[in-house]
Amino acid sequence: MLKDYFKLKENGTSVRIEALAGLTTFATMAYIIFVQPVVLGAAGMDAGAVFTSTCLITAFATVLMAFLANYPVAVAPAMGHNFFFAYVVVLTMKIPWQVALGAVFLSGIVFVATASFGLREMIVASVPDSLKSAIAVGIGLLITLIGMEWAGIVRLDPNTFVTLGNLSSKPVLIALLGLGTTIILIARRVNGAILIGILVGAVAGLFTGIVKNPGSVLSVPPSVLPTAFQLDVWTALKQNLIAVILIFFFLDLFDTVGSLIGIAKQAGLMKEGKLPRAGRALLADAIGTVGSALSGNTTMVSYIESAAGVAVGGRTGLAALVTAGMFVIAMFFSPIVQMISGGLAVQEVINVEGQQIARTFTLYPVTSPALIVVGSLMIRSVRDIDWNDFTEALPAFLTLIVMPLTFSITDGIAFGFISYALLKVVTGRGREAHWLIYLFAILFIARYAVPGLH
């Protein structure tokens, strides 16, 4: 039955190959179940509930992808979007996480509408490639900076903003070991390199006492109720969070389209330059985001790590089905996840204008290497920016540099859109920009100019 439904013979594959592909994809993306509880935990959400939610919603959305689109693609909470949710919307904008979940839900509804009514092509085409690439690079730089800080490799400094951390301390050495392991394995093209790096750091942490022994390996999954159905949609609408909702939507749309096209090209699924069943694939992602908000999680995207499964022969949704099954199984290993994603409180004394001030901060030596590596992989998009055209290069540069400097993805996108529209107009090339660019530039200017909107 599965052979016929997923058309294994027509796609030149088998149950064994699809199973191997599904396991490979899981190994390459399993780091999200360790990282997501830490990121959303920083926003005040229950880490155990986030862990269970991550496993459940990933399995749900990936099953949708398998049956709706028959693609070997896994869908999970997006790296980058989770940091926008926690560090920008909740911690910087001071919006309660329940309201932020409401914004995620609304962005998912917008995504469902565009996927259902065929508006995605116009929206994707409206944003120039240089800005799309710069957004990915900027998010990558921000994630890398946070990863470096979590590792203790760099630390905040009142005089220079950031400075080098204590590289001889145990937590930093554990982080460097995990980072070095991951980098070497990626260079050697080993599948699951990020996951292996996390596990190496965890084992080293156990031996050095940095990581606490969990006591057990298996347990009943933590309850999802502390975060499930806690979203506040009404307040998200009242608080004028249109910019936040649209940014969630755009990030989701761009990431998903980019990942699907990249994976489809590798798998040979493109036909005459087009992706068959693209609407169904986007709908699976969009429904996943709606479900994610309901379960207490962030926007969902098609994971580019699915390309690892494609590389070993995955061609159909059966591979995605296997990946989904692995995330369900992972729920029962919560003691291991809690051990790995736990933070370590560190105290230090810093000099501020001649005064000695003690401060406490939290390091995540086991999971931080994953952020640094994922961030570095996102920066590869910088090669797609046209650096020879100043009207393309400057907006792209402002986009990618403002994000890490302000810890704000929103401000980076705003600077990029405003400067892009301005430069195209003053150089007499206004027709090169889509009318949506000008609309968003005006909205972003109003956001800064009108009190209460920023």
Which positions does each model-derived feature cover?
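Helix-loop-helix hairpins and the membrane-proximal interhelical loops
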Residues: 1-49, 162-164, 196-279, 353-357, ...
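Hydrophobic alpha-helical transmembrane segments
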Residues: 1-7, 47-54, 74-86, 187-197, ...
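Loop-to-helix transition at the N-terminal end of transmembrane alpha-helices
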Residues: 43-63
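Internal alpha-helical transmembrane segments of multi-pass membrane proteins, especially GPCRs
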Residues: 52, 102-105, 246, 283, ...
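Transmembrane alpha-helix interface/packing and boundary motifs in multi-pass membrane proteins
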Residues: 61-74, 183-189, 248-255, 285-295, ...
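Conserved, well-structured core segments that form the ligand-binding/active-site neighborhood
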Residues: 72, 202, 206, 313
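Membrane-embedded alpha-helical modules
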Residues: 93-203, 207, 321-454
